[in-house]
Amino acid sequence: MSIPKIIHYCWFGGGTISPENRKCMESWEKYCPDYKIIEWNEQNFDISKNRYVQQAYEAKKYAFVSDYARLAVVYEHGGIYLDTDVELVRPLDELLELPGFMGFQTNNEVATGLGFGARKGNSVVQALLRDYDALDFLKADGSADLTPCPERNTRVLQALGVRKDGTRQSIAEMEIFPAEYFCPMDLYNRKLRVTPKTYSIHRYAESWKPKPGAVSRILQRLLKKHYYTWYCPLRGRIERRLRKRT
């Protein structure tokens, strides 16, 4: 059984897809012309099926809704998921005979937003889904859990045997590829290194994030992933306390 020729993408919240992302999506039709493309949104995906997802949706943190939804639709239907800012540079057909595939980012975390695929009912995708079962998006203090899905998913994959070293490896029903296959653009400095092995480029449009000012851009470069997992939550707590005093 092959991975079906379906490309899934998520677009929750009803916003407009940017021209830059539309251009990326045009590459899907160019290199996968016989694939069915399905958009998943609040009209055809059950937000209430998972507490974490429902809380994230109500908080209008739609990227975190997609973190779960992409796993669910690939598990239930099979196929390939792509973020809207993923540009294909060659066909994906030769990946269809694998039971499943994912890729490392340049920081050696596995990221489903780069693009991943699997047959319906894939056991590794199921394990990633189950990790969300006991999670709340909202913490006890009312703040949001902004743990990025690559960090969360990679912990689960490590428990299944993945080595966080960026090398090609196989676990159960999943092939994990080095960054050059699906992530030739560096996560932090945005340098692009396309090779003959590259299938796609994740453009890191990050339309769900507020546009940073000069100070924030400097902090992002210095703190890297800790900017969103440590600095932003801390800043949010301080801002809430200040608002309560006014």
Each model region followed by its residue ranges:
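Glycosyltransferase-associated regions of secretory-pathway enzymes
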Residues: 1-66, 84-246
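Small-residue hinge/turn detector
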Residues: 68-79
